[in-house]
Every structure is written in structure tokens, then in C-alpha cells.
Amino acid sequence: MSKDEYLITDAPLKALTVFAMPMILGSFFQQVYNMADSIIVGQFVGSSALAAVGACAALTNVFICVALGAGVGAGVLVSRYFGAKEYGKMKTIVSTSLISFLLLSILLGIFGFCFSHAMMSGLQTPADILEEAVLYLRVYFVGFPFLFMYNILSTMFTSIGESKIPLVLLIFSSILNIVMDLWMVAGLGLGVFGAAFATLIAQGISAVFSLLIFFNRMRRYQSPFQRFDGRGLRSMLRIAVPSVLQQSTVSIGMMIVQAVVNPFGTQALAGYAATMRVENVFSLIFVSIGNAVSPYVSQNLGAGKTERIKKGYHAALVLDVCFAALAFLVIETLHTQISSLFLGKDGTALAYQVSEDYMRSLGYFFIFMGIKMATDGVLRGLGIMQPFLIANMVNLAIRLSVALICAPRFGIDFVWLAVPAGWLANFLVSYAALRKSWPGEKVESSRIFS
């Protein structure tokens, strides 16, 4: 038995823990990578520059979610064929996805660059930080194809049970990003532009290394394959499109929240931007667990070991409870210190109040996000996409309703309630669908993916 096949052989909790931990650590370094801009800009330039960088975060996350969702669409099929040892079909999906998504990333980068000003204006970005926010965003979109392809390749690695290589590459690129940030922002005084350009360089190097290592790994599987397969692309898109929408509900929700927060002023936005970075750190832990569940489910489905799927789901819930408790303890103990890390001495009392209120609210309710992501991960791994999509649209609708209706009338505190309310509603719908969809021990994987 190959060591790459531990997701279909080891005890479910052990297999998921071994598989998910590098992904969780990778998520941490991904956020270190992202937070470096905010921390260094906030400390060396000021809270207005921090607000400019933070104002871009919700929008850039939407584009990142397109990359993540596209990767999931390919990854579910790669996992299925890997579990079934159909390596020729696996490599066909890999080649088709890389060609298709490289073109998509270039088109999205051009679109984002051209419409940066319009998008930031549409989010009601305060006038005093608008131009810096647009500058940061345009540099970001120049490097977007690198970021997109890195995320696709990272998903490919995890689909074949390899989660350590993306972690090593993320650690390397995170360190490089911090060094470049310090040099360009603190050393050269390039401000917001320097922070964005440092990130672009780190993303580019990481993407190139990922591509070279992945191609080398594929040489292990000597099977003939097609460079491009239209049917394979359609199969990917049937999973990828709902996955993009699911991944995007988190970021679109953040954009909605930001649009509601923006009229409260620059200092309220600075406080929100500080906590949004913290939210991203913990959110990506639960996203990583959900993303680990999908290839686990898909590989076991492909291998015909459907009895392991429910056990894997329960193992994921155990991991979610543990990390939700950790998030609560960290936030309750260190919320003031965490806020000061971003806001520094330049932050006003309002900025600190907004940051700490939002952060503590999240700490109480992260468990809802955890169980939602695990349940969604199982549905995605089974290829059951319609209820998966409906559940995430319910999530977005709840966020819209609570944030847009309650916050302007009752105050900014109601913004924070919109997020966990959406998570809980999403879980309830997803779980109801999952209870009706557990595959029997003799279910064939082709029935699920057709």
C-alpha cells in the first residue's frame, strides 16, 4: 500500500489530523503572509494606510475564493481518480485544469486592474483613503495569476494526500514577504505600494516553485493522458461553480459588512480591518478542515470504502470543537493586545472599541463556522452540489438581512451578529441535506459524480 493512500487506510481521526494539520499551519502562514502588509503598514505608515490596505481585503478575498473554488472543482475529481488508481484520468484532469484556470486568472487580473477604482468606490470606501486603496489593489491584480495558480496547485497536492509541500512553500513565501515588506515599507518608505509589491514578488516565486515540484510529483504516475478534455472541464465546472459561490459567501459577507461599516468613518473601518485579519486566521483553520474532508470523502468514495465517510465527518467535528475552544480562549485573553498589534499608538478609542467588540463576538460563535465547513466538505466530496449551493446562499441572505436592515437602525454592534447567524443557518440546511445523502456501502462513485 502506497504511503500516499493513508486517507483510505488509516483510522479516520488520525488520517484527517495528519492530513489537515499541515493545511491548518499553511492557513496560518497564509494569514501571516497577508497580515504582514497590515501590521507593517499600520506600524510604519499609520492607521489611515492600514485602513486603505484593510479596505481591499474583503474584495481581494472574493477573487481568492474564485481560485479556491476552482481548485476544489478539480481537486474532488483528482481525489476520486487517485483513490480509484485511475492515474491517466487523474493526469488529464490536472492538465485540463491548469490550462483552463491559467487563462481564467489572466482575464480576472485584467478585469480587476481595470475596475479597481469602480469597485472600491462601490464599497463606499472613505474618500481620504480611496486612492491608496486603489493603488494597493491594482498592484495586487498584476500578480493575481501567480496567486491563482499557487492555490490551484496547492489543492492538487492535497487531493493526492500531500499537504506538507504547500506548507513548506507557504513558510518560505511568508518569510520572504515579511522581509520584502520591511525593506520596501520601513526601509525605502514606499508605503502602501511597497507592501503590495512585496506581496507580488513572494506570490510569484511561490507559484513557480509549486509548479516545478508538482510536475516532478506527477512523474510517479506513468499513465497516458490527454492534454485537454472538454468533458473533464465540464465535470470540474459542475463542482467548481458551486464551490466558488460557497467560498465567496464568506468574502461577499465580509464585503457586505464592510459596506455597512464604511459610513461609520475611517477609524471604525481601521478597527474592523484589524479584526478582519484575526477573523481570517481562525476562519481559515475551519476552512482547512472542511477542505481536508473533501478529498478524504472523495478518495474513500473512489476506493469503494463508503463506510469510512461518516466516521471521517465525526472526526472533522472533533477537530472543529477543539479549534473553536482554542479561538475562544485566545480572543478572550488577548483581544486588547491583538488589536494593538494592528492599530498601534495611532489608533483611536473608537478603532479599539470596534476591533475588540467584533473580535469577542467572533470568539463566541466560531463553532458555528466549524461545523458548517465540515458538513459542506462532506457534501462537496460526495459531489452533492445543489443543496450545498442552496445552504450557502441562505448563509449570504441571512448576512444581508441582518447587516443591512439592523445595523443602520440599531447600531454597528448588529453588524457582528450577521456573521454567526449566517453560519448557523448554513449548517442547518447542509446537515438536513447530508442526513438524506449518506452513501450506502455498495454505492458506486460514478452515481455521485455523474
Task: Please give the residue ranges for each predicted region.
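Short alpha-helical transmembrane segments in multi-pass integral membrane proteins
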Residues: 1-20, 78-143, 187-241, 297-364, ...
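Short runs within selected transmembrane alpha-helices of multi-pass transporters and secretion channels
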Residues: 71, 140-158, 166-174, 195-208, ...
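Transmembrane helical elements of multi-pass membrane transporters/channels
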Residues: 18-37, 139, 173, 202-206, ...
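Helix-terminus/linker motif at the lipid-water interface of multi-pass membrane proteins
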Residues: 28, 32-50, 120-127, 183-190, ...
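Hydrophobic transmembrane alpha-helices of multi-pass small-molecule transporters
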Residues: 62-65, 177-181, 206-211, 281-284, ...
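Residue-level signal for short hydrophobic patches within transmembrane helices
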Residues: 9, 13-32, 36, 59-66, ...
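Interfacial/gating helices of multi-pass transporter permease domains
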Residues: 18, 41-61, 127-132, 192-193, ...
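Small-residue-rich hydrophobic transmembrane alpha-helices
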Residues: 50-110, 147-166, 271-335, 369-383, ...
